[in-house]
């Protein structure tokens, strides 16, 4: 998993509530267990018409937002079914950070596990960031995870909270497996302990 330390990128404004996981990645694309290749189908119903052509009025089909790495929405992002394909699709599209007033719990957790930083901010702050994003390609946001601050184009810093353990995992680029493997030496040492460590070792001498 790639480390997340500081991201300066285009943000896409999507002022919509209750964006569910079926909107993020429709069920017909869930047959794969690969984490890559889903980005082209992220928000498929909104991005494409019945003939597979892009809908020009959808934000992620517009410049500069087709290159966005930050997504700003309204409440309850990621509601619906608990498909992990949803953060896979966002990440494969290029999204590394999602900002909203609230998230569905499972989606929120799955974002962290897949290298996406979800940030909760009040709706009025989300509105301000969306206004920044609408200024175009020259209006980029900086998300600094080390300092836990979002820097607006005008230089104003907006602090955000994040769980310390999850922050550590993103800063180090660790998923659950990576976190386990970071303790490989301790695991190996434990595996080589006697199977009944509570039984004292007794040396029996030779009887003469």
Curated annotation (Swiss-Prot):
Entry EC number(s): 4.2.1.33
Catalytic reaction list: (2R,3S)-3-isopropylmalate = (2S)-2-isopropylmalate
Keywords associated with the record: Amino-acid biosynthesis, Branched-chain amino acid biosynthesis, Leucine biosynthesis, Lyase
GO biological process: L-leucine biosynthetic process
Annotated metabolic or biological route of this protein: Amino-acid biosynthesis; L-leucine biosynthesis; L-leucine from 3-methyl-2-oxobutanoate: step 2/4
A GO CC annotation given for this chain: 3-isopropylmalate dehydratase complex
Molecular function in Gene Ontology: 3-isopropylmalate dehydratase activity
InterPro entries: 3-IsopropMal_deHydase_ssu, Aconitase/3IPM_dehydase_swvl, AconitaseA/IPMdHydase_ssu_swvl, IPMI_Swivel, LeuD
Function: Catalyzes the isomerization between 2-isopropylmalate and 3-isopropylmalate, via the formation of 2-isopropylmaleate.
Protein name: 3-isopropylmalate dehydratase small subunit
Organism of derivation: Gluconobacter oxydans (strain 621H)
């Amino acid at each position: 998993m790639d480390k997340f330390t500081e991201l300066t990128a285009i943000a896409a404004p999507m002022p919509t509530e209750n964006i569910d996981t079926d909107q993020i990645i429709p069920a017909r694309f869930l047959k794969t267990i690969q984490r890559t290749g889903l980005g082209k189908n992220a928000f498929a119903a909104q991005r494409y018409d019945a003939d597979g052509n892009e809908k020009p009025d959808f934000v992620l089909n517009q410049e500069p937002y087709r290159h966005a790495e930050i997504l700003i929405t309204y409440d309850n992002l990621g509601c619906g079914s608990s498909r992990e394909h949803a953060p896979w699709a966002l990440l494969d599209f290029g999204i590394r950070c999602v900002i909203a007033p609230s998230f569905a719990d499972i989606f929120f957790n799955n974002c962290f596990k897949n290298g996406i930083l979800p940030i909760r901010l009040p709706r009025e702050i989300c509105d301000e960031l969306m206004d920044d994003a609408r200024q175009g390609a020259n209006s980029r946001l900086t998300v600094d995870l080390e300092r836990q601050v979002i820097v607006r184009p005008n230089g104003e810093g907006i602090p955000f909270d994040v769980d310390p353990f999850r922050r550590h995992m993103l800063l180090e680029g660790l998923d659950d497996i990576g976190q386990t493997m970071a303790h490989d030496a301790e695991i190996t040492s434990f595996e080589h302990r006697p199977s009944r460590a509570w039984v004292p070792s007794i040396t029996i001498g030779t009887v003469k």
